[in-house]
């Protein structure tokens, strides 16, 4: 099987039902205890239970949210060395998300304007702020 065939796309993960990560934006990264927390502006699709029609000046329903990876053992960015998760998280940039997948080696990969970040952790949890 090819490398792509061995991956599970974010679209197949129930945590991301009715959202569009490719129209979402990473604002910051940090580690809280052993959980990687990615602060995002999340694009909700019209089927999402918290979707609200955007005002005329906006095209999308964007809500502040967190993507959390509990029990984060390590992070690696763009082929760099593994290291202390909190230190690596502090140095990751921000920007639009292009992809998130579960790789065939059991690690997650999130890509975007900030590069590609490899995450060894439990499965992601999506939390809307204020809900």
Give the positions of each predicted feature.
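Surface-exposed, interaction-prone regions used to assemble/regulate multi-protein complexes
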Residues: 1-131
């Amino acid at each position: 099987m090819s490398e792509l065939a061995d991956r599970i796309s974010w679209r197949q993960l129930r945590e991301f039902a009715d959202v569009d990560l490719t129209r979402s934006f990473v604002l910051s990264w940090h580690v809280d205890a052993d959980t990687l927390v990615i602060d995002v502006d999340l694009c909700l699709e019209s089927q999402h239970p918290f979707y609200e029609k955007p005002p005329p000046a906006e095209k999308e329903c964007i809500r502040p949210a967190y993507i959390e990876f509990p029990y984060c053992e390590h992070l690696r960015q763009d082929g760099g060395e593994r290291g202390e998760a909190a230190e690596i998280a502090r140095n990751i940039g921000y920007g639009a998300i292009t992809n998130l997948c579960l790789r065939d080696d059991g690690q997650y990969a999130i890509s975007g304007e900030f590069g590609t970040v490899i995450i060894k952790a439990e499965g992601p949890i999506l939390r809307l702020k204020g809900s």
